[in-house]
């Protein structure tokens, strides 16, 4: 699972996700990609589930690039704990994904296989996605 090796601060502010992604909006490594059309936090477990769904469908053929990394921690308090008395303990890691960001890329397989693999991966994610191709240069 994807987690940072070390971080400067264990607990972070939630922050806001306004607007579109600034970078990473085009397919750069592979031939096909999965682009987010809405903004959301994506956990390291969701990223791993999407990766497994893609690689199993492709039967270990082709190459997959994961272009997002869960660098932001999120906290949670235990169930039944009253309000106050500090911020909760770190619960997991998330990648804040804005709309327009290409999250996964695939190369080395046909378009039909890539389209289906990315469709299966999109069902594991909390964002609406669309299939994109590399722009002809």
Swiss-Prot record:
Alphabetized UniProt keyword annotations: Ribonucleoprotein, Ribosomal protein, RNA-binding, rRNA-binding, tRNA-binding
PROSITE patterns the record matches: RIBOSOMAL_L16_1 (PS00586), RIBOSOMAL_L16_2 (PS00701)
GO molecular function terms noted in the UniProt entry: rRNA binding; structural constituent of ribosome; tRNA binding
Gene3D superfamilies associated with the record: Ribosomal protein L10e/L16
Gene Ontology CC: cytosolic large ribosomal subunit
Gene Ontology BP annotations: translation
KW RNA-binding (keyword) present: yes
Family listed: Belongs to the universal ribosomal protein uL16 family.
Quaternary structure note: Part of the 50S ribosomal subunit.
Protein name in UniProt: Large ribosomal subunit protein uL16
């Amino acid at each position: 699972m994807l987690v940072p090796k070390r971080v400067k601060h264990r607990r972070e502010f939630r922050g806001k996700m306004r607007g579109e992604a600034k970078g990473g909006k085009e397919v750069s490594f592979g031939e096909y990609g999965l682009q987010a059309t809405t903004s959301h936090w994506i956990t390291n477990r969701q990223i791993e589930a999407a990766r497994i769904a893609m690689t199993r469908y492709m039967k270990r053929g082709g190459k997959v690039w994961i272009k997002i990394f869960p660098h932001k921690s999120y906290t949670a308090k235990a169930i039944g704990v009253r309000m106050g008395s500090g911020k909760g303990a770190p619960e997991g890691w998330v990648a804040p994904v804005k709309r327009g960001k290409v999250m996964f890329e695939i190369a080395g397989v046909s378009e039909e296989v890539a389209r289906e693999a990315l469709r299966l991966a999109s069902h594991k994610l909390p964002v609406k996605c669309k299939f994109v191709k590399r722009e002809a240069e």
